[in-house]
């Protein structure tokens, strides 16, 4: 039974904590938890524990927070737990080859894409921005490469026209634990069937940046609408007006051709703020000026109509 496996869990954010909670709720034997060191957070920059640490301490589990797993003494922390398998979910630290080889069944990782598509740091956002019809989770055997290990189990879900990275995150946080628990059972039973990744199908999900989230009006309206959903809730797509950043929470595509230069404001009314793009028209529906809450286009026009005069161009 997989419940008899000695499991080390390594993870840091809420996404990882949901997987740890599922393991504990289903009776698995977690013998130790590794998570990143407490970090300064909030206005007061007070040291805050990770969601994984909070949960582990609530459950009375041993918690380890090394800055790195490269030093021999930190690797010994792993070895001393004599684990059968190490489960890694959004841990944030590199596992050296020596650590990968310590557990009897190796280390397995929950990755937020259908590998080999979207290896890397931002698979949820990249799949949405690219217009993929579906995404999912892959449970894989870890090796020294970046998300290059053999695939053990996959679960998929559709990407809808309303999905944001936030909603996809929640969907995958539900799928991941299901796939993880199934995989652990298969590993314990000896029924797991590792599948080598097809290198011809590999794409990379590079880390997001705030500058990348700045709206580029030369792109098509369809691309920009996906970008806005992909960058919600972080880092948020934004545009600049009078030197101020304005976040865009929601937009829609108007399939009408226009000869106006990209970035030109075409209309500004209660239906939204219509802006010409490289292909089609983007209708801005919900925006957030600096220091304010998100609001409808209509509410913003009531206070800042001078920002959106038809014929003017947005930078």
Swiss-Prot record:
A Pfam family per the record: Formyl_trans_C
Keyword Protein biosynthesis belongs to the record: yes
E.C. code: 2.1.2.9
Reaction(s) catalysed (UniProt annotation): L-methionyl-tRNA(fMet) + (6R)-10-formyltetrahydrofolate = N-formyl-L-methionyl-tRNA(fMet) + (6S)-5,6,7,8-tetrahydrofolate + H(+)
Record-linked InterPro entries: Fmt (IPR005794), Formyl_trans_C (IPR005793), Formyl_trans_C_sf (IPR037022), Formyl_transf_N (IPR002376), Formyl_transf_N_sf (IPR036477), Formyl_transferase-like_C_sf (IPR011034), GART_AS (IPR001555), Met-tRNA-FMT_C (IPR044135)
GO CC entries: cytosol
Protein biosynthesis keyword on record: yes
Any GO MF annotation of the entry: methionyl-tRNA formyltransferase activity
Keywords from the named record: Protein biosynthesis, Transferase
Enzyme's top EC category: transferase
Membrane-spanning ranges: none
Residue positions binding (6S)-5,6,7,8-tetrahydrofolate: 113-116
Classification via HAMAP family: Formyl_trans
Stated role: Attaches a formyl group to the free amino group of methionyl-tRNA(fMet). The formyl group appears to play a dual role in the initiator identity of N-formylmethionyl-tRNA by promoting its recognition by IF2 and preventing the misappropriation of this tRNA by the elongation apparatus.
Listed NCBIfam families: fmt
Assigned protein family: Belongs to the Fmt family.
Protein name: Methionyl-tRNA formyltransferase
Organism: Shigella dysenteriae serotype 1 (strain Sd197)
Encoding gene, per UniProt annotation: fmt
């Amino acid at each position: 039974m997989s419940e008899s496996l000695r499991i080390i869990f390594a993870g840091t954010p809420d996404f990882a904590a949901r997987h740890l909670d599922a393991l504990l709720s289903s009776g698995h034997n977690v013998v130790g938890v590794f998570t990143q060191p407490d970090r300064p957070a909030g206005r007061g920059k007070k040291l805050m524990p990770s969601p994984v640490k909070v949960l582990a301490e609530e459950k009375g589990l041993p918690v380890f927070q090394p800055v790195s797993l490269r030093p021999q003494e930190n690797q010994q922390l792993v070895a001393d737990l004599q684990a059968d398998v190490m489960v890694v979910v959004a841990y944030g630290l590199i596992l050296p080859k020596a650590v990968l080889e310590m557990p009897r069944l190796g280390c397995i990782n929950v990755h937020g894409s259908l590998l080999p598509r979207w290896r890397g740091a931002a698979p949820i956002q990249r799949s949405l921005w690219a217009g993929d019809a579906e995404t999912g989770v892959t449970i894989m055997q870890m090796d020294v490469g970046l998300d290059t290990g053999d695939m053990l189990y996959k679960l998929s879900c559709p990407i809808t026209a309303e999905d944001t990275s936030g909603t996809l995150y929640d969907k995958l946080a539900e799928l991941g634990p299901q796939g993880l628990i199934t995989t652990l059972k298969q590993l314990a039973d000896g029924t797991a069937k590792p599948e080598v990744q097809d290198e011809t199908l590999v794409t990379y999900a590079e880390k997001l940046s705030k500058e990348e989230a700045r709206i580029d009006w030369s792109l098509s309206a369809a691309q920009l609408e996906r970008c806005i959903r992909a960058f919600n809730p972080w880092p948020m797509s934004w545009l600049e007006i009078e030197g101020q950043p304005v976040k865009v929470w929601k937009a829609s595509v108007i399939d009408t051709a226009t000869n106006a230069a990209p970035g030109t404001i075409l209309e500004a009314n209660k239906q939204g703020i219509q802006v010409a793009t490289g292909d089609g028209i983007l209708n801005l529906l919900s925006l957030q000026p600096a220091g304010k809450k998100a609001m409808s286009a209509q509410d913003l026009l009531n206070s800042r109509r001078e920002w959106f005069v038809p014929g003017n161009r947005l930078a």
